[in-house]
Amino acid sequence: MSDSVEMFTDGACKGNPGPGGWGVLMIYKGVEKELWGGERETTNNRMELMAAIQGLMSLKRECEVVLTTDSQYVMKGINEWMVNWKKRGWKTAAKEPVKNADLWQQLDEQVNRHKVTWKWVRGHIGHPGNERADQLANRGVDEVRAQR
């Protein structure tokens, strides 16, 4: 696995729930690729998850990925909560169904295809990769709104 990909992901939602978008900036050997999309009725957390899922799904072969997100929800889910959710059959400690379990399961499947290193960055402080992902997520929102 010598292919190393830098990936920056972000989600956006206008209203929560409301129209939302996700964005991904990938950099591989100096070449950039942008991905974005959106949904008419969603939440910010779902769009944060979707950005990571779509970015990882777009990779054609097993890669080393450094995935940077500004989402504490994604970071805590992947690094702290998911292992116990899986042990409990996708239930929380309170025995409630995990919110967004459909997307967490997709993310788990994609993470297992690659060697992913997760990084968190504070949002909206001028980090270039994160700012680009944010712009792409907002493009996703704008395109969904334009379809109405």
Curated annotation (Swiss-Prot):
User: What are the UniProt keywords, alphabetically?
Assistant: Cytoplasm, Endonuclease, Hydrolase, Magnesium, Metal-binding, Nuclease
Q: Record's Gene Ontology CC terms?
A: cytoplasm
Positions of disulphide bridges: none
What this protein needs as a cofactor is: Mg(2+)
Where does the protein end up?
Cytoplasm
Instruction: Report the EC number(s), separated by commas if there are several.
Output: 3.1.26.4
What GO terms describe the biological role, i.e. biological process, of this protein? DNA replication, removal of RNA primer
Q: Where is the RNase H type-1 domain?
A: 1-142
Specify where it is mainly localized: cytoplasm
Q: Which SUPFAM superfamilies match?
A: Ribonuclease H-like
- Protein's recorded name: Ribonuclease HI
UniProt source species: Pseudomonas putida (strain ATCC 47054 / DSM 6125 / CFBP 8728 / NCIMB 11950 / KT2440)
**What gene name is given for the protein in this entry?**
rnhA
